Amino acid sequence: MRWTVLSTLAVFGVAACGSEKKGDASQTAAVATANAAPAPAAPAAVVEVKMTGDGTSKAAFEPATLTVKAGSVVRFINVSGGPHDIAFYTDSVPKGAVDALKKGMANTMGDLVGPFLTQPNEHYDVSFAGAPAGKYRGYCLPHVALGMHITITVQ
């Protein structure tokens, strides 16, 4: 009888130890799964466009044409001859692009019209995240008569 009790205790002891190891294994698997989370997405590429001019007879985007990948951010920088802004012709963007541009343009003065940049080195970012591929034609509202136009091709 004594052997039966000791044998029974030994079996329960082994079972208890075995269940602890199983718990440790499942905890290790849970930690490994948590550590295997995907890496955060790389930040969007930022492409700079200078806004220049003498304030009276010439004004330009530099460069006036550029190609960017979908998801890029175009940073418009007032270098000289401001105030400047960036506006896009709603009838000169790809089909479905108006809503994507509205999402990518914060603090607008109107549909697809960014704010005035009045100070040197002031900038305004336009995100092309979710924007369909194609040509986006834009202009600077105060200097459109001086030919300040830009074409951005999104690939």
Give residue spans per PLM region.
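C-terminal motif of bacterial Sec signal peptides marking the signal peptidase cleavage site
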Residues: 13-16
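Alpha-helical transmembrane segments
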Residues: 8-11
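Bacterial N-terminal signal peptides that target proteins for export
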Residues: 1-6
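Extracytoplasmic copper-binding redox domains, predominantly the cupredoxin/blue-copper superfamily
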Residues: 18-155
